[in-house]
A protein has these predicted regions:
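A structural signal for short, hydrophobic/glycine-enriched beta-strand patches
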Residues: 2-177
């Protein structure tokens, strides 16, 4: 028989973020973490190539439009050591431009190679004030780690989780009669 252990573990991580936290009426900044694109395919075919975390980009669009005065940072460099020219920011810039978002309103941080660097480099760019409301858009399974890194670096971010991999009422064994 097949027991979906991986799904169960992801569910345990994601469940904390199933309900979107109420977004404040005023949002001063939006931080979108990279990892939703395939820079190699983008470079090869000159087409936007999104991966299984595409919601990071797609779901950011209505948020960017709603809070059009907010500072927006897309953070994603290259995770490929010998190819620093292949970053997520390049693909994201093309994506936003293609769907009609003014790319001048987005700051593309393209040096980070991992979540830690996403937070560190983006915080330097954001220079957040203590009373500012900053949203963090990333995958639900990635949110806790990103928030822990931000907290350790004195940056209070409001989670806006996307890219869920499991339904809200996931059960490891849905029906014992099936066993």
């Amino acid at each position: 028989s097949f027991i979906p252990i991986g799904s169960f573990l992801i569910y345990k991580i994601e469940k904390e973020y199933h309900s979107h936290i109420k977004i404040p009426e005023i949002v001063d900044g939006i931080l979108i973490l990279g990892g939703a694109t395939d820079p190699l395919l983008f470079k090869e075919y000159d087409q936007i190539s999104l991966n299984g975390s595409a919601e990071r980009l797609v779901e950011s669009v209505p948020i960017i439009k709603k809070f059009d005065k907010a500072k927006v940072i897309f953070s994603g460099g290259s995770g490929i050591i010998n190819r620093p020219d292949l970053g997520h920011s390049q693909v994201a810039k093309s994506f936003y431009k293609k769907i009609g978002i003014e790319i001048d309103q987005i700051i593309f941080e393209d040096q980070s190679r991992n979540t830690y660097e996403n937070i560190i480099y983006s915080k330097k760019i954001a220079n957040p004030k203590i009373n500012e409301n900053w949203l963090l858009i990333t995958s639900a399974s990635h949110m806790k780690r990103a928030l822990l890194i931000a907290d350790k670096n004195n940056w209070k971010l409001i989670p806006y989780a996307v890219d869920f991999k499991n339904i809200k009422n996931f059960k490891l064994i849905p029906n014992f009669r099936l066993l």
